[in-house]
């Protein structure tokens, strides 16, 4: 699971660099990793916070001394229907990725 173990804590900055927190950071590769992270959090009595692309000015993803799940690697556009303007993406997709995909279709 993940690239950092539970014993590793790391200082994370919000994208706007106005706030920071020390978190146990995990980079899940699949849904099974997510289940394992939730089981770990439940066993330890700690909370889980999520970060998508990590480019929000807010600091909602910071989860001080708790688990931070970094989903920036989950950055695929799964489906795009230009006729209806509906797009399905993973949580790490950026606005720039969305624009590159939809603007050429007139959206």
Predicted regions and their residues:
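Glycine-rich N-terminal segment of FAD-binding domains in flavoprotein oxidoreductases
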Residues: 16-107
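Conserved oxyanion/phosphate-binding beta-strand-loop segments in alpha/beta enzyme cores
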Residues: 1-12
């Amino acid at each position: 699971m993940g690239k950092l173990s539970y014993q590793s804590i790391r200082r994370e900055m919000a994208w706007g660099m106005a706030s920071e927190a020390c978190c146990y950071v995990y980079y899940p590769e699949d849904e099974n990793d997510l289940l394992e992270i939730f089981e770990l959090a439940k066993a330890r009595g700690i909370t889980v916070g999520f970060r998508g692309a990590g480019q929000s000015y807010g600091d909602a993803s910071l989860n001080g001394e708790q688990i931070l799940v970094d989903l920036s690697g989950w950055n695929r556009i799964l489906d795009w229907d230009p006729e209806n303007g509906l797009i399905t993406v993973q949580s790490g997709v950026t606005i720039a990725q969305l624009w590159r995909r939809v603007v050429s279709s007139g959206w």
